[in-house]
Amino acid sequence: MSPRALKVLEPAATDPALIRNFCIIAHIDHGKSTLADRMLQITGVVAERDMRAQYLDRMDIERERGITIKSQAVRMPWGFDGDFYALNMIDTPGHVDFTYEVSRSLAACEGAILLVDAAQGIEAQTLANLYLALENDLTVIPVLNKIDLPAADPDKYAAELAGLIGGKPGDVLRVSGKTGVGVDDLLDRVVQEIPAPVGAADAPARAMIFDSVYDSYRGVVTYVRMMDGRLGPRERIQMMSTRATHEILEIGVSSPEPTASKGLAVGEVGYLITGVKDVRQSKVGDTVTSAAKPAVDPLPGYTEPKPMVFSGLYPIDGSDYPELREALDKLKLSDAALVYEPETSVALGFGFRCGFLGLLHLEIITERLSREFGLDLITTAPSVIYEVTTEDRNVITVTNPSEYPAGKIERVEEPIVKAAILAPKDYVGVIMELCQSRRGTFLGMEYLGEDRVEIRYTMPLGEIVFDFFDNLKSSTAGYASLDYEPAGEQEADLVKVDILLQGEQVDAFSAIVHREKAYAYGTMMAGRLRELIPRQQFEVPIQAAIGARIIARENIRAIRKDVLAKCYGGDITRKRKLLEKQKEGKKRMKMVGRVEVPQEAFIAALSGEVGKKGKK
């Protein structure tokens, strides 16, 4: 602990001029949680013996994957030039799925530390978050992290960073989150450069929610940044988007463990607990005001998080359905962006259709379901929202291939995204080829420094949600990084491909694909199922169809008994009679026989774990 962090300012009595609100923005794995750890240690808010790596990442998944999913806010004391300041650090998620959370966290700050790995340089997410910070008019402090690494090249990347945000390479701070080198200077720079918060102390209270976390003992803990006025304990508050009123049971600051205080005043960042049990009651981005003297206008920038990717979740054991419902209800308490509704599938039984912010969100939810609740699940291939207009001008929103209308269709619209890919210049050709193959439209490219390129495309979201990211990583030796943002909708020539087993449709394998790729999807799925479904006593045709037109077919050969084994030599007519009789029997079986698709075949076919991984 530094001796400069001895005097702690009292919340609610702090002059706004002595407050600094800042966040750290960086690409995944550039070390922002480690830098946050060092700051907590140097300012003494976490004792040496309590310290653990990634102190602010509370979930096991966050610590294992090394990613931050939920924002955290910490108040730290720091002395500079004889004055003592209160620094509020807001730790933000770095992943593209959580861009809305990041934008709200940025709106709660006046400055941002732009952290870049000195061995890796600028990546896609760094740029995306930098643009968000500049949109919010934040003061940006450029910092190179991990300078203790043998592979670090601080001079090269300092020049790159200075070129990106304007300024001299000498202005770029060099720190090491691991060893703590340069962190004191960084805290000084925060005090010097980041402006103090501005707000009207005597106006009606307005606070912006930038995160809310569910605590199993105390209900929802809402993290807020006070913009105007003040709030105190036992005061009645109102949420401006839902008009719901609650009583504040406890209000305080987290440093980093929650510490109750007499209230929060202008510019301060803290938490409030109202005893509400559902996170949807305190929405990220909403404005909190006093119920007795409410503010007139809410703070700008609030939007409802919209799910982008849909997937079906089914328990492998049908009797786990009530547990799955309960688990989703519990996750919903801490994750307001998750939406789900029950659905049934002929093949997979009862389950839920869930909407997610993106693929990482989907992965994290399924991992938490299996880890925290011990559920074994099948997830169907992810799909996006399509707007289908039928011939009689009805517009149908399709989130699941089984909802796709039969009959004549006038047009189909699909969501598109603007994708930015950053990679070394040697991989430009490979990346462009990959994007073109996914129906991408080239927007432009820029060189950032001598050897890094940013390539911009608009692409259908449906093409990204499958295995685009895996292919991008494997074709660029892991160097490329991707960032995307929604960019509206476009009309597309899409069709629904059904898979028929012995003439009967299996709904779990249906998919909405582009007409050009329908044949490839049909042959791949039919071939995959031929390998997975066990042979029956009779021949089973597997067909892929668009409407009534069959586009691909595979046969599973029948298992046949050797009926001629008992004939030693003898007349050909005798043998023929036995073979004809067998043929008749197989024909009869085929009329009445049903094909059971084993559970393993479903899981393998949907996850693509047969031979070479194809497009799902």
Curated annotation (Swiss-Prot):
GO biological process annotations for this chain's record?
Answer: positive regulation of translation
GO CC terms in record: plasma membrane
The tr-type G domain, residue ranges: 17-198
Q: How does it sit in the membrane?
A: Peripheral membrane protein
Q: Which GO terms of the molecular function aspect are on file?
A: GTP binding; GTPase activity; ribosome binding; translation elongation factor activity
Does the record bear Protein biosynthesis in its keywords? yes
Give a single Pfam family match.
EFG_C
Q: Which residues bind GTP?
A: D29, H30, G31, K32, S33, T34, N145, K146, I147, D148
Q: Which SMART domains match?
A: EFG_C
PANTHER family, per database record = TRANSLATION FACTOR GUF1 HOMOLOG, CHLOROPLASTIC, TRANSLATION FACTOR GUF1-RELATED
Q: What is this protein called?
A: Elongation factor 4
Gene, per the UniProt record = lepA
